[in-house]
């Protein structure tokens, strides 16, 4: 069943476990984490030690039926056990970029929505649960629109 949910959410990561699913009003909340496996340091090949977990709340607007989908992702922090190396890194998910609060598919869905010239950035922002400034930045990041020259007097 977990594989079906992962395919439905357009998440292609085989190491992810769905630990819990909640529905609270018009918000669906899915708790995700990676399977625990032995990690080795990419720098010195020593065994890594888990230094704890932290939680990220990710907006994943794949549902367009009036529900808001939140992914609660639990990531582990890893530290190298070699005292000369001491490398730190975190679990990585291929559908979330570093430091982002929305999934990687969100900008493409926003750009697809912005094709309609009758929709404002505020309307798109409300639909995807982000700020209108973020919609504007996404639009400018992916589209290179040249300015028209000023008219001569």
Question: Predicted regions span which residues?
Answer:
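Short, conserved DNA-binding cores of transcription-related domains
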Residues: 1-87, 92-93
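Short, positively charged, Gly/Tyr-enriched micro-motifs
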Residues: 60-153
């Amino acid at each position: 069943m977990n594989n079906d949910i992962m395919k439905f959410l357009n998440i292609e990561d085989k190491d992810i476990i769905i630990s819990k699913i909640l529905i609270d009003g018009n918000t669906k909340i899915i708790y995700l984490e990676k399977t625990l496996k032995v990690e080795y340091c990419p720098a010195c090949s020593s065994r890594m030690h888990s230094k704890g977990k932290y939680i990220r709340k990710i907006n994943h607007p794949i549902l367009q039926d009036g529900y808001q989908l939140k992914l609660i992702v639990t990531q582990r922090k890893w530290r190298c056990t070699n005292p000369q190396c001491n490398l730190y890194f975190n679990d990585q998910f291929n559908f979330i970029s570093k430091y982002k609060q929305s999934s990687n598919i969100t900008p493409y869905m926003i750009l697809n929505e912005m094709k309609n010239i009758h929709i404002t950035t505020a309307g798109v922002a409300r639909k995807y649960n982000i700020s209108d400034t973020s919609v504007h930045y996404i639009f400018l990041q992916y589209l290179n629109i040249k300015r028209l020259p000023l008219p001569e007097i």
